[in-house]
A protein has these predicted regions:
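C-terminal motif of bacterial Sec signal peptides marking the signal peptidase cleavage site
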Residues: 18-22
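Ser/Thr-rich, low-complexity intrinsically disordered terminal regions
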Residues: 24-141
Length: 141
């Protein structure tokens, strides 16, 4: 009886390990040269940029306008910018930009109430494209 229980516990542990290994997934999305320290946790996508706050702020506004997001709220406070957008389905998109003390800028993206990793990555890549465009064409500033 005791041996049967040990076998069942061992089988359950092996099944749990296999299930956990199948749930782990690597990030297949290509990262950009401008973006460092990308992380996704608890519905918020976070990335650091080697750029200025002014350029990243402008890139966020351009990318969201290109995605036809409607601006609902805009807040500036010292080294922090906060935007709340809404898409055509009524889903909120929150973007926070914070200037870091050691240089660079940190951006946080949250799409919807629970977060959406794939959409956040797509928005991050669109913002990075806009930032690259702003850096290469100085007349666009």
């Amino acid at each position: 009886m005791k041996m049967m229980r040990n076998v069942l516990v061992l089988a359950a542990m092996i099944g749990l390990c296999l299930f956990g290994a199948s749930c782990a997934r690597r990030n297949e999305q290509p990262t950009s040269a401008n973006v460092t320290n990308e992380q996704y946790s608890w519905g918020t996508y976070r990335a650091d940029f080697d750029s200025t706050m002014f350029l990243l702020d402008k890139a966020v506004r351009n990318a969201c306008a290109r995605a036809r997001l409607v601006k609902r709220e805009q807040t500036f406070s010292g080294n922090l910018s906060f935007y709340k957008y809404q898409d055509v389905d009524g889903i909120e998109v929150k973007v926070t930009i914070v200037e870091l003390k050691e240089g660079g800028v940190r951006m946080k993206i949250r799409i919807g109430s629970m977060g959406d990793k794939e959409s956040s990555q797509k928005l991050l890549l669109a913002i990075d494209d806009e930032l690259r465009l702003l850096v290469t064409t100085p007349a666009a500033m």
